[in-house]
């Protein structure tokens, strides 16, 4: 029977530990350190018990809550409420106090999604026609794709999570567009490369890759292998990913907040283990073969996406978002 308890990050770790196989074409996935984020706080009963990927549910609920509670919206997703379902939407609306408690985390989730889609639009404008979403969860971009018919979207996820997503799409009345290709990959049986080849992914075409909420759970070596995945793709390919800076780079308030969150995920046996400083990371990326990088820090992200708001929605953490192009 399919294991429905597998988390989104643990699934990705299995995939990305073998990312160098994209270049070598022969290596299977390596044994990965178990790592997964603690699920974001969700209303009781939201999305139903026993469903796969609590982290995918948590991120989807935060995107949905943003549509309900935040104005103006940083990330406008007209399908965010539909895909989580009427029961989850009702639970969100019935508990606005919880939305205030999750405001900072919600800001992070919607900022990184908005930034990734802004970068995707820019990549499309310069000719990129493939979008690879690693650990797509309940992401709805493919179903509201403004470039439908021109941009092919490939969503990689565990088969259980993709089956659950397809059921959610059907239940919500959201059609699966022709430009969306699901790539269910069971890393106990196949590599990421073979899974993508089976569904028609073109490794010889420039590709935009999103990798959100993963890097901090990887060992440094696995993180580097993950980034090598993109350098093995066609020139012009690009990745957007988020990461955290080391403790020494944080102020007292930020450090205290991190320690509370870190203790929670460590107690679950899934610690954050890898941090990067922006300038050394940019140098590392150039050494791997990326031709250009662009780092968005929290100060710049707040200025770009959360300026002049009256509702208090803003980043308060230490997460940066990096964009790197081959």
Please provide the spans of the model-predicted regions.
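A conserved beta-strand element that flanks and buttresses the S-adenosyl-L-methionine
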Residues: 210
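A short, conserved alpha-helix within the catalytic core of class I
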Residues: 218-229
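N-terminal secretory signal peptides
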Residues: 1-7
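Conserved beta-strand signature within the Rossmann-like core of class I S-adenosyl-L-methionine
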Residues: 234-244
């Amino acid at each position: 029977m399919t294991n429905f308890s597998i988390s989104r990050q643990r699934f990705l770790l299995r995939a990305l530990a073998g990312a160098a196989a994209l270049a070598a074409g022969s290596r299977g996935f390596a044994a990965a350190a178990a790592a997964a984020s603690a699920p974001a706080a969700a209303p009781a009963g939201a999305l139903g018990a026993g469903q796969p990927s609590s982290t995918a549910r948590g991120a989807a609920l935060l995107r949905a809550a943003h549509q309900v509670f935040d104005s103006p919206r940083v990330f406008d997703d007209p399908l965010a409420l539909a895909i989580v379902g009427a029961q989850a939407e009702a639970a969100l609306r019935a508990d606005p106090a919880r939305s205030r408690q999750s405001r900072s985390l919600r800001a992070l989730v919607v900022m990184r999604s908005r930034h990734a889609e802004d970068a995707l639009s820019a990549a499309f404008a310069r000719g990129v026609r493939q979008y690879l979403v690693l650990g797509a969860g309940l992401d709805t971009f493919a179903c509201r794709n403004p470039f439908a018919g021109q941009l092919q979207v490939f969503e990689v996820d565990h088969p259980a999570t993709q089956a659950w997503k397809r059921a959610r799409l059907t239940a919500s009345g959201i059609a699966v567009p022709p430009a969306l290709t699901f790539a269910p990959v069971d890393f106990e049986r196949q590599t990421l490369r073979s899974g993508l080849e089976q569904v028609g992914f073109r490794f010889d075409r420039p590709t935009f890759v999103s990798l959100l909420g993963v890097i901090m759970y990887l060992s440094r070596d696995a993180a580097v292998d993950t980034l090598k995945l993109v350098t093995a793709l066609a020139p012009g390919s690009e990745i957007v990913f988020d990461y955290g800076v080391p403790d020494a780079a944080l102020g007292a308030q930020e450090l205290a907040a991190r320690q509370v969150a870190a203790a929670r995920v460590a107690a679950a046996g899934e610690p954050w283990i890898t941090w990067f400083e922006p300038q050394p990371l940019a140098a590392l990326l150039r050494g791997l073969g990326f031709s250009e990088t662009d780092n968005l820090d929290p100060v710049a992200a707040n200025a770009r996406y959360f300026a002049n708001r009256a509702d208090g929605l803003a980043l308060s953490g230490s997460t940066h978002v990096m964009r790197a192009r081959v």
